[in-house]
C-alpha cells in the first residue's frame, strides 16, 4: 500500500492566495543544476505550484528528467493551451502568441510542477509528449483542435470534441463565442450525407486491420445510444468473436464549450455553469471554481463557510456514489438496488433543497461564501438522514455486493496496476484501489478538511471492477463520518466574507462613504474585477480529481478558464484495460468507472 504523505508542503502556512515564484521548491534547484541557472523563466502566480517556462527544444528532455528523478513526477495531470495574443499583463514572461502547459504530479513528493512552452503564431509546432506519458494523446488532440498547435509525432492528431468536418479552432480569441455570430445553420441533403460519411469508422486510420490471413474481424458500434454507455458515448469495438481485440472510444457528443463560456461570463455568473460539468456532483463542482477565484481575489472565508461547503459537498458525494453503486449492480444484472438508491437519494435531495432551494444544480456557493445562511431545522433533517443511511448501506452489501454472481462478473475484470493508473492520469477510487491513497482532502486539504477525522480507503495493489465499487461503499461511510462532525461542530459566524470584491457593503457604510457606494454600483452592474494573475485549485470530486486553472487579465471576466475533469482521463484508459476481454466484461468495466459524459466532454 502506498499512502505516502511525506514532504506535505503543497500548503504552507502563508495564505493560499499569496503570489509566489516557488524558487524554494527543491525541483527548481534540481532543474537548474541539470540545465543551468538561466535555462528557464519562473513565473510567479497564485496557482500554488512552480510554473516554469521551458524552451520548446528542451521540453522532452525536461519532461524525461522530471520523470526519472529519485522522487519522480509520474503523472501528467493536465495538458492544454492558451491564446496569449490579447493578454496585456505579461510582464517578465517570454514572448508568445500561444502557449501550452504541462501539469505534472509527483506522488512521492506530493508536489506539482507546471511546464509552459511559448509558441509563435507562425510556428505552432512542438514535439508530442506521448512518448513520455501515454495519456498526453487525448489532451494533445483537444489542444490541437481548440487552438491549432501541431504536436509532431502524435500517433493520430484528429478532432476529438467537435465533428470531423468542423472548421476552425474554437478557443482562439478571434473565434466567435456566441451562436448569433455565426451564419444561420442549414442542413442540406448534401451536408447531411457529408456528415454521415465523416462519421464512418475506417479501421486503417486507427492502425487496425480488417482481417488476418486466417480470419476477418468484426467492427461493432457500442453506442452512442447504448444504455450501458451511461450517456451519449460511442465505442468502436474490433472483435474476434466476443473477444475485444482493440477499441476506439469516441467522445464529444455532449460538448457544450464550457471553457469558452468562461471567457464571456462574469466571475460570479459562471458559477451555475460549473454545476453542469458533472451534473450529479452539484456543489462539489462549484468548490474548485470558487476557491480558485478566491485565490485571485485574496479572500479568506469564515470558518462557518468552510464547514457548510464541506457539508454540502459530502451530501452530493453520497448522492453520486449511491447512483454509481446501484447502476453498477444493474449493469451486472440486478435491478432492486436501483430502487433502493433512489429512495435514499430522495432524502438527500430533500435536505439539499431545504438548505439551498434547489436539488441537482443549486449554484449555491458564492465567491467568498454561500448564498445564504443555513435555514432553521437543517440540523434535524441531517440528523434524521445520518440515523437512516448506515443501515441502508449494510443492506446494499448484503443484498447485492456480496453476491457470488456479481463477484464472479467483476473480480479481476479490467484490472490495472498503480503504474498503469498513474500513466493514464487515473484519480479517485480507480487510483486508490491500486493502493495509492491519494485523496486531495487528506493530502492537500482545502475548505478546512484538515479539521475532520476520516480515513482514505485503499485497495491491495490491483484496481479491478469489484475493488473500485467496494471502495466507493467505504467512501460513503467516511462521508457519513464527516457529515456527523459537521452536525456536531458547526461554527457560529457569518456565511460570507466581508470583502469588497464579493460582498455589498452595509447600508450604513454607503451612507457615509461615497466611494463605497460607487464600488457597490460597479460590482453589481459590471461584476468584480479580479487582479491580473493565475490561480489553480484541485479538489476530490465524486469521480476523481477535478480542477480549475483560471487566468485573469485584470477584467470582469476570465481570460482563460481551464476545466480538468477526471472522467476524460478515465475514458482514455479504456482500450489499455479491456483488450483481450469479452464484450460482457466491457459493460461491467464501464459501470465500474463512474463517469457521466458531461464530465468528459464539458
Swiss-Prot record:
Keywords: Cell inner membrane, Cell membrane, Membrane, Multifunctional enzyme, NAD, Quinone, Translocase, Transport, Ubiquinone. It is an enzyme of class 7 (translocase). Residues 216-602 are annotated as: NADH dehydrogenase I subunit D. It is found in: Cell inner membrane. Gene3D superfamilies: Cytochrome-c3 Hydrogenase, chain B, NADH:ubiquinone oxidoreductase, 30kDa subunit. GO terms for molecular function: NAD binding; NADH dehydrogenase (ubiquinone) activity; NADH:ubiquinone reductase (non-electrogenic) activity; quinone binding. Its EC number is 7.1.1.-. It catalyses: a quinone + NADH + 5 H(+)(in) = a quinol + NAD(+) + 4 H(+)(out). Its main location: membrane. InterPro entries: NADH_DH_suC, NADH_DH_suCD, NADH_Q_OxRdtase_suD, NADH_quin_OxRdtase_su_C/D-like, NADH_UbQ_OxRdtase_30kDa_su, NADH_UbQ_OxRdtase_49kDa_CS, NADH_UbQ_OxRdtase_CS, NDH1_su_D/H. Pfam families: Complex1_30kDa (PF00329), Complex1_49kDa (PF00346). The keyword Cell membrane applies. It comes from the Bacteria. One of its GO terms (cellular component) is plasma membrane. The keyword Membrane applies. Residues 1-192 are annotated as: NADH dehydrogenase I subunit C. It is a peripheral membrane protein. NDH-1 is composed of 13 different subunits. Subunits NuoB, CD, E, F, and G constitute the peripheral sector of the complex. NDH-1 shuttles electrons from NADH, via FMN and iron-sulfur (Fe-S) centers, to quinones in the respiratory chain. The immediate electron acceptor for the enzyme in this species is believed to be ubiquinone. Couples the redox reaction to proton translocation (for every two electrons transferred, four hydrogen ions are translocated across the cytoplasmic membrane), and thus conserves the redox energy in a proton gradient. In the N-terminal section; belongs to the complex I 30 kDa subunit family. This is NADH-quinone oxidoreductase subunit C/D. It comes from Klebsiella pneumoniae (strain 342). The gene is nuoC.
Amino acid at each position: 500500500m502506498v499512502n505516502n504523505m511525506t514532504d506535505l508542503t503543497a500548503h504552507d502556512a502563508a495564505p493560499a492566495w499569496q503570489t509566489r515564484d516557488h524558487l524554494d521548491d527543491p525541483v527548481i534547484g534540481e532543474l537548474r543544476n541539470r540545465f543551468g541557472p538561466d535555462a528557464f523563466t519562473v513565473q510567479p502566480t497564485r496557482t500554488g505550484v512552480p510554473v516554469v517556462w521551458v524552451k520548446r527544444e528542451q521540453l522532452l528532455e525536461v519532461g524525461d528528467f522530471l520523470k526519472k528523478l529519485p522522487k519522480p513526477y509520474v503523472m501528467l495531470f493536465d495538458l492544454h493551451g492558451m491564446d496569449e495574443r490579447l493578454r496585456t499583463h505579461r510582464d517578465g514572461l517570454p514572448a508568445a502568441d500561444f502557449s501550452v502547459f504541462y501539469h505534472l504530479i509527483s506522488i512521492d513528493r506530493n508536489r506539482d510542477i507546471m511546464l509552459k512552452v511559448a509558441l509563435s503564431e507562425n510556428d505552432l509546432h512542438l514535439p508530442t509528449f506521448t512518448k513520455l506519458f501515454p495519456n498526453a494523446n487525448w489532451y494533445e488532440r483537444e489542444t490541437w483542435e481548440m487552438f491549432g498547435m501541431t504536436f509532431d509525432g502524435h500517433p493520430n492528431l484528429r478532432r476529438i470534441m467537435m465533428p470531423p468536418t468542423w472548421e476552425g479552432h474554437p478557443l482562439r480569441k478571434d473565434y466567435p463565442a456566441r451562436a448569433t455570430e455565426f451564419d444561420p445553420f442549414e442542413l442540406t441533403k448534401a451536408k447531411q450525407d457529408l456528415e454521415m460519411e465523416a462519421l464512418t469508422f475506417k479501421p486503417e486510420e486507427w492502425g487496425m486491420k480488417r482481417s488476418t490471413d486466417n480470419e476477418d474481424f468484426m467492427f461493432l458500434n457500442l453506442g452512442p445510444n447504448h444504455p450501458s454507455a451511461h450517456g451519449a458515448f460511442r465505442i468502436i469495438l474490433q472483435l474476434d468473436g466476443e473477444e475485444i481485440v482493440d477499441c476506439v472510444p469516441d467522445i464529444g457528443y455532449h460538448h457544450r464549450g464550457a471553457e469558452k463560456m468562461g471567457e464571456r461570463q462574469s466571475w460570479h455568473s459562471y458559477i451555475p455553469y460549473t454545476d453542469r460539468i458533472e451534473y450529479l456532483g452539484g456543489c462539489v463542482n462549484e468548490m474548485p471554481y470558487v476557491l480558485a477565484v478566491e485565490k485571485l481575489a485574496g479572500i479568506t472565508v469564515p470558518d462557518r463557510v468552510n464547514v457548510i461547503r464541506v457539508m454540502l459537498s459530502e451530501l452530493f458525494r453520497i448522492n453520486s456514489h449511491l447512483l454509481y453503486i446501484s447502476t453498477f449492480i444493474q449493469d451486472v444484472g440486478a435491478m432492486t438496488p436501483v430502487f433502493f438508491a433512489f429512495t435514499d437519494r430522495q432524502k438527500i435531495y430533500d435536505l439539499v433543497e431545504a438548505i439551498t432551494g434547489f436539488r441537482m444544480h443549486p449554484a449555491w456557493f458564492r465567491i467568498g461564501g454561500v448564498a445564504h445562511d443555513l435555514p432553521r431545522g437543517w440540523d434535524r433533517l441531517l440528523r434524521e438522514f445520518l440515523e437512516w443511511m448506515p443501515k441502508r448501506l449494510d443492506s446494499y452489501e448484503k443484498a447485492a455486493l456480496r453476491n457470488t454472481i456479481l463477484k464472479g462478473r467483476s473480480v479481476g475484470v479490467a484490472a490495472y496496476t498503480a503504474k498503469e493508473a498513474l500513466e493514464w492520469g487515473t484519480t479517485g477510487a480507480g487510483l486508490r484501489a491500486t493502493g495509492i491513497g491519494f485523496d486531495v482532502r487528506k493530502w492537500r486539504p482545502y475548505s478546512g478538511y484538515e479539521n475532520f477525522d476520516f480515513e482514505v480507503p485503499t485497495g491491495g495493489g490491483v484496481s479491478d471492477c469489484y475493488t473500485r465499487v467496494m471502495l466507493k461503499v467505504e467512501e460513503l461511510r467516511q462521508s457519513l463520518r464527516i457529515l456527523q462532525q459537521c452536525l456536531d461542530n458547526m461554527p457560529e459566524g457569518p456565511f460570507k466574507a466581508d470583502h469588497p470584491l464579493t460582498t455589498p457593503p452595509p447600508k450604513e457604510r454607503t451612507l457615509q462613504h461615497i466611494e463605497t457606494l460607487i464600488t457597490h454600483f460597479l460590482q453589481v452592474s459590471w461584476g468584480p474585477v479580479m487582479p491580473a494573475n493565475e490561480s489553480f485549485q484541485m479538489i476530490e470530486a465524486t469521480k476523481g480529481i477535478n480542477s480549475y486553472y483560471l487566468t485573469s487579465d485584470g477584467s470582469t471576466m476570465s481570460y482563460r478558464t481551464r476545466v480538468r475533469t477526471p472522467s476524460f482521463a478515465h475514458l482514455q484508459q479504456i482500450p489499455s484495460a479491456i483488450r483481450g476481454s469479452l464484450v460482457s466484461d466491457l459493460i461491467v468495466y464501464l459501470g465500474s468507472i463512474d463517469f457521466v459524459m458531461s464530465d468528459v466532454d464539458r
